[in-house]
């Protein structure tokens, strides 16, 4: 019997990436179906945001909109090269993007560290370009912020969790941490937005390591 294994995903380069579209795939998004808040703002004074990738974005968005202090979520693509990509293009692995949830939150009610920790606990950040059976560069673990100060705060939580995972026999964390502009985040198509509210029995995989992060609530 012959065994066949798919090649490991490889990150596309800027020169190899698809050119993308001239216009966003979702230009006038409807309000959030659960929270009722605008998907693209305007935001309230003091609200902050972070972009989080933990694998398939459907379940991740639901997890965050259920958290106290989170006042807006949407799903989209970031971290790559192709402007205004479609879902199909992202799934081809030729855009460099990962599936992302934008989380808008009130820092007086929930901290950046709590948001990061919840994400780390909800997936396996040591899996590289995959989460469970979802394989591809678009499923990589990632946290993107608007400034270096927030990125440093994210890194501190991720690094500490990495040490905890090592003590439990896991490998190195592969989570990508970076600073992006809001214009580097591209909304996904309408049917992806609040997908599990529209489709309660939809696909919602869980790939948690079961190891707590240890950030105080």
UniProtKB/Swiss-Prot annotation:
It comes from the Bacteria. GO terms for molecular function: L-methionine-(S)-S-oxide reductase activity; peptide-methionine (S)-S-oxide reductase activity. Keywords: Oxidoreductase. InterPro entries: Met_Sox_Rdtase_MsrA_dom, Met_Sox_Rdtase_MsrA_sf, MsrA_MetSO_reductase. It is an enzyme of class 1 (oxidoreductase). It catalyses: L-methionyl-[protein] + [thioredoxin]-disulfide + H2O = L-methionyl-(S)-S-oxide-[protein] + [thioredoxin]-dithiol; [thioredoxin]-disulfide + L-methionine + H2O = L-methionine (S)-S-oxide + [thioredoxin]-dithiol. GO terms for biological process: cellular response to oxidative stress; protein modification process. Pfam families: PMSR. HAMAP family: MsrA. PANTHER family: MITOCHONDRIAL PEPTIDE METHIONINE SULFOXIDE REDUCTASE. This is Peptide methionine sulfoxide reductase MsrA. The lineage of its organism: Bacteria, Bacillati, Actinomycetota, Actinomycetes, Mycobacteriales.
């Amino acid at each position: 019997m012959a065994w066949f294994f798919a090649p490991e995903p490889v990150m596309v380069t800027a020169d190899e990436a698809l050119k993308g579209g001239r216009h966003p795939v979702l230009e006038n998004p409807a309000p959030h179906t659960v929270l009722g808040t605008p998907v693209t703002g305007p935001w309230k004074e003091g609200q902050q945001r972070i972009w989080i990738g933990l694998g398939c974005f459907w379940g991740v968005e639901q997890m965050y909109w259920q958290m106290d202090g989170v006042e807006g979520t949407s799903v989209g693509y970031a971290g790559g090269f192709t402007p205004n990509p479609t879902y199909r293009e992202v799934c081809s692995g030729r855009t460099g993007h990962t599936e992302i949830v934008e989380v808008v939150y009130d820092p007086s009610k929930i901290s950046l560290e709590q948001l990061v920790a919840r994400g780390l606990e909800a997936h396996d950040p040591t899996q590289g370009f995959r989460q469970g059976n979802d394989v591809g560069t678009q499923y990589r673990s990632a946290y993107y912020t608007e400034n270096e100060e927030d990125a440093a705060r994210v890194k501190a939580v991720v690094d500490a969790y990495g040490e905890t995972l090592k003590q439990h026999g896991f490998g190195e964390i592969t989570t990508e941490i970076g600073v992006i502009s809001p214009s580097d985040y591209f909304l996904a198509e309408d049917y992806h937005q609040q997908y599990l509210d529209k489709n309660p029995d939809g696909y919602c995989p869980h790939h948690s390591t079961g190891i707590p992060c240890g950030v105080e609530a």
